[in-house]
């Protein structure tokens, strides 16, 4: 069930991600409070939705979000763990909230007024078969016409994303199509 409307691939460090944010004219100050995973997902979603001609202030009750990665929220978990150090025990609530990997889905949904279901899965590696199946699960809800999906990873200061907007055209999305976007 699906036709790719738009997609992007990003592989960058935190500084370049901020540059992308500025070049997109996002004007979303909350971006600077987010963890790296959420920043990467938000920028990738912005690129994909802008390419598709969708405005972030229009409600999207017919769209869902499906994201996958390998490391869950490990990047931010490490930072949060540092705030628990015995000699400096001041856990940061702003770090804690991002120790949940599905927060990136919520950030994307809030920014873009996506009102459908959001799902985040952790897989050992990118699996186009799993992604195609998860897109199918989202389209099982007859109200959903679009799925914003992707692989969003953050490890060792690098963020990488493959994000795509899939439209339900009544045919199954081929795993090979998703694989070609990931490369």
Q: Which residues fall in each region the model found?
A:
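Conserved "HGTGT" condensation-loop signature of ketosynthase/thiolase-family condensing enzymes
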Residues: 1-144, 148-183
């Amino acid at each position: 069930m699906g036709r790719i409307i738009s997609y992007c691939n990003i592989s960058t460090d935190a500084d370049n991600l901020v540059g992308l944010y500025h070049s997109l004219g996002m004007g979303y100050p909350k971006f600077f409070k987010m963890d790296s995973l959420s920043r990467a997902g938000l920028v990738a979603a912005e690129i994909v939705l802008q390419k598709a001609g969708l405005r972030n202030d229009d409600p999207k009750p017919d769209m869902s979000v499906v994201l996958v990665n390998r490391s869950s929220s490990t990047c931010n978990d490490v930072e949060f763990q540092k705030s628990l150090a015995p000699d400096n025990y001041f856990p940061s609530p702003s770090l804690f909230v991002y120790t949940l990997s599905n927060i990136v889905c919520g950030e994307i949904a809030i920014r873009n007024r996506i009102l459908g279901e959001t799902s985040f899965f952790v897989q050992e590696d990118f699996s186009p078969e799993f992604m195609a199946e998860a897109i199918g699960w989202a389209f099982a809800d007859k109200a959903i016409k679009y799925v914003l999906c992707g692989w969003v990873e953050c490890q060792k200061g690098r963020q990488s994303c493959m994000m795509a907007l899939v439209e339900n055209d009544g045919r199954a999305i081929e795993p090979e199509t998703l694989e070609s976007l990931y490369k």
